[in-house]
Amino acid sequence: MASSSLPNLVPPGPHCLRPFTPESLAAIEQRAVEEEARLQRNKQMEIEEPERKPRSDLEAGKNLPLIYGDPPPEVIGIPLEDLDPYYSDKKTFIVLNKGKAIFRFSATPALYLLSPFSIVRRVAIKVLIHALFSMFIMITILTNCVFMTMSNPPSWSKHVEYTFTGIYTFESLIKMLARGFCIDDFTFLRDPWNWLDFSVITMAYVTEFVDLGNISALRTFRVLRALKTITVIPGLKTIVGALIQSVKKLSDVMILTVFCLSVFALVGLQLFMGNLRQKCVRWPPPMNDTNTTWYGNDTWYSNDTWYGNDTWYINDTWNSQESWAGNSTFDWEAYINDEGNFYFLEGSNDALLCGNSSDAGHCPEGYECIKAGRNPNYGYTSYDTFSWAFLALFRLMTQDYWENLFQLTLRAAGKTYMIFFVVIIFLGSFYLINLILAVVAMAYAEQNEATLAEDQEKEEEFQQMLEKYKKHQEELEKAKAAQALESGEEADGDPTHNKDCNGSLDASGEKGPPRPSCSADSAISDAMEELEEAHQKCPPWWYKCAHKVLIWNCCAPWVKFKHIIYLIVMDPFVDLGITICIVLNTLFMAMEHYPMTEHFDNVLSVGNLVFTGIFTAEMVLKLIAMDPYEYFQQGWNIFDSFIVTLSLVELGLANVQGLSVLRSFRLLRVFKLAKSWPTLNMLIKIIGNSVGALGNLTLVLAIIVFIFAVVGMQLFGKSYKECVCKIASDCNLPRWHMNDFFHSFLIVFRILCGEWIETMWDCMEVAGQAMCLTVFLMVMVIGNLVVLNLFLALLLSSFSADSLAASDEDGEMNNLQIAIGRIKWGIGFAKTFLLGLLRGKILSPKEIILSLGEPGGAGENAEESTPEDEKKEPPPEDKELKDNHILNHVGLTDGPRSSIELDHLNFINNPYLTIQVPIASEESDLEMPTEEETDAFSEPEDIKKPLQPLYDGNSSVCSTADYKPPEEDPEEQAEENPEGEQPEECFTEACVKRCPCLYVDISQGRGKMWWTLRRACFKIVEHNWFETFIVFMILLSSGALAFEDIYIEQRRVIRTILEYADKVFTYIFILEMLLKWVAYGFKVYFTNAWCWLDFLIVDVSIISLVANWLGYSELGPIKSLRTLRALRPLRALSRFEGMRVVVNALLGAIPSIMNVLLVCLIFWLIFSIMGVNLFAGKFYYCVNTTTSERFDISVVNNKSESESLMYTGQVRWMNVKVNYDNVGLGYLSLLQVATFKGWMDIMYAAVDSREKEEQPHYEVNLYMYLYFVIFIIFGSFFTLNLFIGVIIDNFNQQKKKFGGKDIFMTEEQKKYYNAMKKLGSKKPQKPIPRPQNKIQGMVYDFVTKQVFDISIMILICLNMVTMMVETDDQSQLKVDILYNINMVFIIIFTGECVLKMFALRHYYFTIGWNIFDFVVVILSIVGLALSDLIQKYFVSPTLFRVIRLARIGRVLRLIRGAKGIRTLLFALMMSLPALFNIGLLLFLVMFIYSIFGMSNFAYVKKESGIDDMFNFETFGNSIICLFEITTSAGWDGLLNPILNSGPPDCDPTLENPGTNVRGDCGNPSIGICFFCSYIIISFLIVVNMYIAIILENFNVATEESSEPLSEDDFEMFYETWEKFDPDATQFIDYSRLSDFVDTLQEPLKIAKPNKIKLITLDLPMVPGDKIHCLDILFALTKEVLGDSGEMDALKQTMEEKFMAANPSKVSYEPITTTLKRKQEEVCAIKIQRAYRRHLLQRSVKQASYMYRHSQDGNDDGAPEKEGLLANTMNKMYGHEKEGDGVQSQGEEEKASTEDAGPTVEPEPTSSSDTALTPSPPPLPPSSSPPQGQTVRPGVKESLV
């Protein structure tokens, strides 16, 4: 019966939990001995067995699996035998606590004293596993943390400290007593988390009893106690696991990053060394106080021969005192280092930098550019040494305040160096930082998959058990019934089976220890009951009580009333009304602003009361209609009631001061929109989902932030207090310091936001460089890069496009759509009725209903009333499902919903019954309904027409792609248009119907001429040259726009040329447009989006041309129209394939990007309104206009006091430019906070704000920081990352749509395919032949050794180090030493180059790396030679620097060695084409915006971010500014001056010399639109596409590198092959095969002894016992990847490919295989043996016969019979020796393989043989005869 099979799967019950006794211990020891013996046996017999693993669901720390039921109370807290079969022969036991958690202990004596049975240890274990114990420890840790945050702890805190130490010591003692110290598994120190405890406690005692000097540094170690929380909270360990995993995975990326940064830092060091110290120094110096005229002498210093000369200030004669006309007191050093002589810009701490090249920054009059003083930012920003350069580049890579570094460098070195920054931002910043993201995301995804798989497995196991159990139960029932029938009495009790408690066999296949029986039935039934109960959250009496109290059905009239209310409240129109109210309410809240009139304020407050009333009424009515019991079952209703209650509370407390924040809760009503707005709903869900997973992560983040905040406070707090004067001129603590916990926390949070460098400078200034760098970079790397990226990875994983595309749940209509459907139906009804009236016949309602369909049903406009999401095309994978779901609605599929169910009501509630299912995703037509469907739903005309897509990559008339008419299938078109050169019709059919005059007969007369003309035009337009010409014109006209800068007025010639050119371009484009109209016809031209774009841009040109003729060119509107010419470059879009691809991808993503954008705006709206509530009108301050200092509140307290001072003239009551005075400005402020640019000023203003119209006071409102912290977490981290999510998702979807190449392969096949793809493209290279010459040969051997390569690598590293040692201002000695070292390196590398060329001869240049080396060597030598020339003759030092960079090329050779780095670079290489396209698009956007910026902001006042170098005056400057903002850096600074709209901020009447433009004011509205749109386009879209591509390719690259066989393995195979096949014949001898496969490296290697293995590979052989390389590689690949039946077809295709690539293989056909060969050998040996035996027997017989013959020779008495026999005997054994010899030799020839004798023709083969082997080609005389021909059919099968 079933009982035999059941033991494996019967779930174990609580009876399996047996106490651990000395007998159990003895049994374990016994099993251990047996296991050891078994392993020994297996080892001797060479039996491999799978490795046993512990069961994952029985790990320590997890809960006892459900299957075991509830453990009885008596087994709780006592040692039990281990349940896991893995530990059956290991000395362990488990203990369960009340929460059913498993604790595993070692059964050896703890601390050598306490056995598992000793009373002390048992007590310790009981304490350790108790829930209260961990609770107590947790509380202790938290209390301890609170004490740690005190910046000035009271005196008694010392004793508290001792208490904590005591508690921790006690905890560790308990653990050691229970577990043992460190010898066995599961002891105290075997758990890494306990190392933490141990070190913390040790440190506590050490610091107490040993005086170690700097205590504060050691005290900081106590902070690690906070990490202990991780051990106590269960979910945290997994997240920390994921973090640690991702850090391991990051190693490659980290190495690559450090390497790249080092290379970049070296480049920076060589290029900009010492540049940042060039300052504007007052020149010439004043001789004495009276003689001031001397340095006011104009002619002297503006003398051009001095100014701008690179080297004059180094000239010693000037520095010597004698040259100063006898004034020997002048001290040059002191003069140039005195800050008083430097030129400072207003409000800046650092002197103005300058440079000596023409495009660098220049000094104002009276100043010269001299290298003096220290570097900017306390001297910490520089490229003077390698370390500072590295820091600068790391900062650049993390994009922190990099605009400052960018501006300083460009000012000092010149604008051309922008290229350096472009490379680093794109390669370093975007690429490397996103690689880190990619790695973290992958690590997280892998971890997730693993857990999911594990759960799945358990689930399946459990299901199987249930199945078995059910069967078992049935069988038992049957047995019982049978028994009852037989015996006639009741069978009592369950029969109990004896079975293994584990319900599973040991992994080794042997049963585990025998255990007492346990009943399967009870176990499962218990488990089932438990599951049932788990689903019910509360005890049963609770439900009874709830039913009584919360369901109101008292009397019949009430129930009736309730029903009526229900019908009203649940009506779709009510929902619509409520939604409209929500929107209106939001509008009302958003209309608050400052300053607001009394009346407006009253209107708003009344409005608020009305809305509160409406929402309260809705809630009350719903409560009545649904009963509280039902009402509170729905999440939305709970949400509503919460908000309504809050609104009412807020009304009650309206006048209480400080509770205005409660008003912000009304904003949550906005979220009610989510009910009817799927995207918002989905987004809230995504955030909800990720908050679950993020809960733990946030905790980890909080712990990290806490730890670092405390560390910072402990380490640096005092220093900030003591050395504050170094960083603050007024010696007050700055806003960012670490003197108390809150400020320390803010600094750490700021670092997490990616802003670390500025606070780090302060810290380094007060507390020393080493400590600050360490702490800050740790926070940066751990917090920002790893944790925040994990955050993003989680978001991405809980995000998926499917949810975006079709999130309308179950396709249920929401009430809004029903309501709107009804309204549309009503309008249709009225329309039909009125039309009827107009036609003079009155239609009855029935007729109208017949024509329209039911209300809300398939009405006229039903198509439009479909919800947005339904129109959107579902992603391919959901397609089937989606189609079904739409058809289900209509009742057209036999889905779960039968058509009958779709009764009349469903029709009414379903306004989108007519949706037709889209066919394939690529087709734009809607599917045509079949006839029955058309009859069923009256289908309006306009829906039946296929929709023409807006953008269509293929059919762009205005692009080079061939034009295909949109309406027809290509096949039809081909039939109608044989040459494909027929123009389409000009007008649509509808036009021709309306105006018959448009119809032209093209068969005769003028019509025919017209047709000929159109065909001619068509030919012209379709010609390639025409297209090329137009592209050229577009580029030229775009280029012309770049010249129209502020200097155009002064350059008359250029201006005139441009004016004429502009006209020419306009005429050309008009001509092009007319040609296309004639050629394509209006219909085609105007149905193409790209053509519309051309049309509009040409229109702009025409209008400005006409205005010029009429003389209106100076009119305002015309001028602003002219700025639209900036859009010209857009026409290039459709003409460049690469850009068009990107644009199409982007356009595809626009719907979902817009969706997310809208949702973000809603999300931000809440924060914006909250900001207006909190800060409107509070940012104003009173300022002294001369010193621009803010008055203290003791002087000026509010606006009126300020105004009373104003008449003195020097006082102004002004506002911060970016503020919260209304919702619009609130949005701008939030954008600045979210991009972390300009957020400081906003935060400072918020923190200082008091009340409306009051003077702010320093940090009076400190906790307003939290508003920003919360916004940054939700508004910035979440919402901005959602953009990345959407874009990446869309990207993947589109890839699925278009690139589904490998969708039709199984996973196995994909692996093979990829391996083969690499394989087929390679063929063995002919190795470079060893030279014949003896000396050359020796050199060759030396050069090709691996040791040689390695030593060169080491030298390259050393060279890198010597380059790093260089510094600015190094001593002459150091310069000489470095020069000599460099010389040595150049000699060595030149030597290497020469040696290689000598040894490899002309083959040297066949290897890419060698060419690279050669170029580097040449450049190094040239650089060395030129450096002397440069010092002698003044060539620009820039050239000199660039030449020195050549040396860095040598470092790049290191990449050859590292495999992991190669993968990453491979990913970069793979993404390059796509990135190039995106770069082009980005440049296009920048180009258009810079033209626009030049025409709008060229004359803006120079302040904050706009100055003499960074402005919109010329095209170059604009591009530089826009490049900066592409990463959103510094856009606040550029926006600030543009926000000046009038005096006193700027002067609208100011004259700008050289032009007739007046004023230096900006245009705030245009400025804000300009910057916000640019940031959204470039930063959010383009940059995120960059990220998406990198993630994508990184995944591909890692997949390739993680595949069992990579490129490298094949490379290695061919490298080894070259040694065995020096002539590249592609064949090797069978005899050498064994050595060959042994020489390979893993995974292809087959180590010796490998003869048998090779035979089983069954390799094909050709005459001469040779084997082809590809066959070997195929076989080895198969060996590594495992065999799969699908291989053969694939192999076939691969072979064909290889044949095509390598013609040499075509010539051979294999005639046998190694396996066959072996079989033949075996046969041959057998035949030989048999034949030898036969010969032996014969010779024995012969001998005996001869002997007898000789005996009986004379005897003639032999009978006749004997004579006959003798004859035969003679024949056989007689004197025919020779013949026998020949015969035997022939036979042996045929069979044997060892002796190769004379060739013999093979015998004819039987048919089965022919099937096995192809017919052989004629054999060359040298080769041995073909084998395998003589083997009888069936031999192969019989022999192995």
From Swiss-Prot:
<feature type="topological domain" description="Extracellular">
    <location>
        <begin position="1246"/>
        <end position="1262"/>
    </location>
</feature>
<feature type="transmembrane region" description="Helical; Name=S5 of repeat II">
    <location>
        <begin position="693"/>
        <end position="711"/>
    </location>
</feature>
<feature type="transmembrane region" description="Helical; Name=S1 of repeat III">
    <location>
        <begin position="1026"/>
        <end position="1043"/>
    </location>
</feature>
<feature type="disulfide bond">
    <location>
        <begin position="725"/>
        <end position="731"/>
    </location>
</feature>
<feature type="glycosylation site" description="N-linked (GlcNAc...) asparagine">
    <location>
        <position position="327"/>
    </location>
</feature>
<feature type="topological domain" description="Cytoplasmic">
    <location>
        <begin position="1456"/>
        <end position="1474"/>
    </location>
</feature>
<feature type="disulfide bond">
    <location>
        <begin position="280"/>
        <end position="354"/>
    </location>
</feature>
<comment type="similarity">
    <text>Belongs to the sodium channel (TC 1.A.1.10) family. Nav1.4/SCN4A subfamily.</text>
</comment>
<keyword id="KW-0407">Ion channel</keyword>
<dbReference type="InterPro" id="IPR027359">
    <property type="entry name" value="Volt_channel_dom_sf"/>
</dbReference>
<dbReference type="InterPro" id="IPR044564">
    <property type="entry name" value="Na_chnl_inactivation_gate"/>
</dbReference>
<keyword id="KW-0739">Sodium transport</keyword>
<feature type="topological domain" description="Extracellular">
    <location>
        <begin position="657"/>
        <end position="658"/>
    </location>
</feature>
<keyword id="KW-0915">Sodium</keyword>
<feature type="topological domain" description="Cytoplasmic">
    <location>
        <begin position="792"/>
        <end position="1025"/>
    </location>
</feature>
<dbReference type="InterPro" id="IPR008052">
    <property type="entry name" value="Na_channel_a4su_mammal"/>
</dbReference>
<feature type="region of interest" description="Disordered">
    <location>
        <begin position="1775"/>
        <end position="1840"/>
    </location>
</feature>
<keyword id="KW-0851">Voltage-gated channel</keyword>
<feature type="intramembrane region" description="Pore-forming">
    <location>
        <begin position="741"/>
        <end position="761"/>
    </location>
</feature>
<feature type="transmembrane region" description="Helical; Name=S3 of repeat IV">
    <location>
        <begin position="1408"/>
        <end position="1425"/>
    </location>
</feature>
<feature type="topological domain" description="Cytoplasmic">
    <location>
        <begin position="623"/>
        <end position="636"/>
    </location>
</feature>
<dbReference type="GO" id="GO:0035725">
    <property type="term" value="P:sodium ion transmembrane transport"/>
</dbReference>
<keyword id="KW-0472">Membrane</keyword>
<feature type="transmembrane region" description="Helical; Name=S3 of repeat II">
    <location>
        <begin position="637"/>
        <end position="656"/>
    </location>
</feature>
<feature type="glycosylation site" description="N-linked (GlcNAc...) asparagine">
    <location>
        <position position="297"/>
    </location>
</feature>
<feature type="transmembrane region" description="Helical; Name=S2 of repeat II">
    <location>
        <begin position="603"/>
        <end position="622"/>
    </location>
</feature>
<feature type="transmembrane region" description="Helical; Name=S5 of repeat III">
    <location>
        <begin position="1153"/>
        <end position="1172"/>
    </location>
</feature>
<keyword id="KW-0677">Repeat</keyword>
<feature type="transmembrane region" description="Helical; Name=S6 of repeat II">
    <location>
        <begin position="773"/>
        <end position="791"/>
    </location>
</feature>
<feature type="repeat" description="IV">
    <location>
        <begin position="1328"/>
        <end position="1626"/>
    </location>
</feature>
<keyword id="KW-1133">Transmembrane helix</keyword>
<feature type="compositionally biased region" description="Acidic residues">
    <location>
        <begin position="925"/>
        <end position="940"/>
    </location>
</feature>
<feature type="topological domain" description="Cytoplasmic">
    <location>
        <begin position="1136"/>
        <end position="1152"/>
    </location>
</feature>
<dbReference type="GO" id="GO:0030424">
    <property type="term" value="C:axon"/>
</dbReference>
<dbReference type="GO" id="GO:0005886">
    <property type="term" value="C:plasma membrane"/>
</dbReference>
<dbReference type="Pfam" id="PF00520">
    <property type="entry name" value="Ion_trans"/>
</dbReference>
<feature type="glycosylation site" description="N-linked (GlcNAc...) asparagine">
    <location>
        <position position="315"/>
    </location>
</feature>
<feature type="transmembrane region" description="Helical; Name=S6 of repeat I">
    <location>
        <begin position="418"/>
        <end position="438"/>
    </location>
</feature>
<feature type="disulfide bond">
    <location>
        <begin position="1546"/>
        <end position="1561"/>
    </location>
</feature>
<feature type="topological domain" description="Extracellular">
    <location>
        <begin position="1109"/>
        <end position="1116"/>
    </location>
</feature>
<feature type="topological domain" description="Extracellular">
    <location>
        <begin position="411"/>
        <end position="417"/>
    </location>
</feature>
<feature type="transmembrane region" description="Helical; Name=S4 of repeat II">
    <location>
        <begin position="659"/>
        <end position="676"/>
    </location>
</feature>
